[in-house]
Design a protein with these regions (language model features):
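Conserved acidic catalytic loop of the alpha/beta-hydrolase fold
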Residues: 150-176
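Short alpha-helix in the alpha/beta-hydrolase fold that links the catalytic acid
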Residues: 114, 259, 268, 282-291
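Catalytic histidine neighborhood in serine/cysteine hydrolases
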Residues: 291-308
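Membrane-embedded segments
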Residues: 77-159
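Short beta-strand/loop motif that positions the catalytic acidic residue
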Residues: 265-267, 272-274, 278
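An N-terminal hydrophobic leader/cap segment in hydrolases
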Residues: 4-9, 14-74
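Hydrolase active-site cap/lid region
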Residues: 192-252
C-alpha cells in the first residue's frame, strides 16, 4: 500500500513536471520566437525586404529620408519601458492622421506599405509604432496585442500631440482626426484598442474609425489553432498550462486577450478585411468578430488572399476600400 502511494505521488510529480516543461516550451515558442531577433530587430533587412516586395516604396522612402521627414520618436510607457515609432507628417498641413500597427515579429518598417497608402495616396500624417519586444522598442517577448493595446493608446495620444494639439497655428491647434489600422497581430491589437477608447480613463475622442486586417478572435483561439496545425495536439492540457504560466510570468492570459470581447464595446466605425485563403489566422475568425461588433461596420473578404497578403495581392482595390471607408468618417 505504501509503495502504491509512493509510486502514485512520484507519477503525479513526474506528470506535473512534464506539463510544466511542455507549457513553458510552448510559452517561449509563442512569445519569444527566434524571429523577434532575426527578423523584427533587423531593421536594415526589413527595409531591403520591403523594397523588394513593394518596389514603389523605395523612391518614396528615399525622398522622405532626403527631406529629413521620416523621423524617430521614443516614449516611455506606464510600465517604464522605452518604445519607438516612425512618423511622417503629411505633405500639406492636416489633422488627418493614421496610427499603423504591425504584426507578429514584424516592425514599423514592415508596415510602410500601409504608411504609403495613407501618407502618399491619402495625404495623412502617419505614425508607425514598434510594439513591445519588436523593432527598436524595449522588450524580449511578444504581448500578442493585449498589453500592447495600452501602448497603442499612448501612441495615439503622442500622434495627436505631434500633429494636432501641441501646435499653435490655426490648422493644427485642434485635435487630430485619427484612424487606427492594424494587420494580423496588429489588427488584433487594433480591435483590443477599440474596446477602450469610448470608456473610462482611455477615452480618445480624436479616434474616428478603425481598420483591422486579418486579426484573430483571441490569443486562446489563435494558439489553440496553431497547436493543432503545427503539432497536431489538443488544447488540453498543454495550452491550459501555458496559459497559467503566462499569467504567472507576464500578468495576463490568453483568454482575457480577446479581440472578440473588445469589439463588442466599440460603437465607432470599423472595416474588417480578411483573405479567404488565410490559414494562419483562419478566415472563419472574421465572421464572429464582424457579428459581435455593433454598427457601423463593413466587411471585405479578399478572394484568394493568404495571411496578411490582401494589400500585396490587390493594392489598388485595397487602397480604394480604405479610402472609401475612412473618407466617410475623416474629411
Amino acid at each position: 500500500m505504501k509503495k502504491t502511494i509512493k509510486y502514485s505521488i512520484l507519477g503525479l510529480a513526474a506528470l506535473c513536471t512534464v506539463l510544466l516543461c511542455g507549457g513553458d516550451y510552448m510559452l517561449g515558442y509563442s512569445l519569444k520566437p527566434d524571429d523577434l531577433v532575426s527578423r523584427s530587430r533587423n531593421i536594415a533587412a526589413s527595409y531591403d525586404f520591403m523594397y523588394e516586395r513593394y518596389p514603389e516604396l523605395h523612391p518614396w522612402v528615399d525622398s522622405l529620408m532626403t527631406a529629413g521627414v521620416l523621423k524617430d520618436f521614443y516614449i516611455e510607457n506606464d510600465r517604464g519601458e522605452t518604445l519607438h515609432a516612425l512618423y511622417v507628417a503629411a505633405a500639406h498641413p492636416t489633422l488627418k492622421t493614421a496610427v499603423i500597427v504591425h504584426g507578429y515579429t514584424d516592425n514599423a518598417v514592415r508596415m510602410l506599405m500601409i504608411g504609403y497608402l495613407y501618407n502618399k495616396e491619402m495625404d495623412f500624417n502617419i505614425l508607425l509604432p514598434d510594439l513591445y519586444g519588436h523593432g527598436m522598442s524595449e522588450g524580449n517577448h511578444a504581448q500578442m496585442g493585449w498589453k500592447d493595446r495600452l501602448d497603442v493608446l499612448q501612441w495615439t495620444e503622442t500622434a495627436d500631440e505631434l500633429f494636432g494639439r501641441r501646435h499653435t497655428d490655426s490648422v493644427a491647434s485642434r485635435s487630430t482626426e485619427m484612424v487606427v489600422h492594424g494587420i494580423s497581430m496588429g489588427a488584433a491589437t487594433t480591435m483590443m484598442v477599440s474596446g477602450e477608447v469610448e470608456h473610462g480613463q482611455y477615452q480618445q475622442p480624436f479616434i474616428k474609425c478603425f481598420v483591422e486586417d486579418c486579426g484573430y478572435t483571441s490569443v486562446w483561439d489563435e494558439f489553440r489553432g496553431e497547436l493543432k496545425a503545427q503539432f497536431n495536439l489538443p488544447a488540453f492540457p498543454l495550452l491550459h498550462t501555458a496559459n497559467w504560466l503566462c499569467r504567472q510570468e507576464y500578468g495576463w492570459d490568453f483568454l482575457e486577450a480577446s479581440a472578440l470581447e473588445q469589439v463588442k464595446k466599440c460603437t465607432l466605425p470599423m472595416l474588417f478585411i480578411h483573405g479567404d485563403a488565410d490559414t494562419f489566422v483562419p478566415t472563419w475568425m472574421v465572421y464572429p468578430l464582424y457579428e459581435a461588433k455593433p454598427e457601423p461596420k463593413e466587411l471585405w473578404i479578399v478572394p484568394g488572399a493568404t495571411h496578411a497578403m490582401s494589400y500585396k495581392d490587390y493594392p489598388q482595390e485595397y487602397t480604394e476600400h480604405v479610402k472609401k471607408f475612412v473618407g466617410k468618417y475623416i474629411h
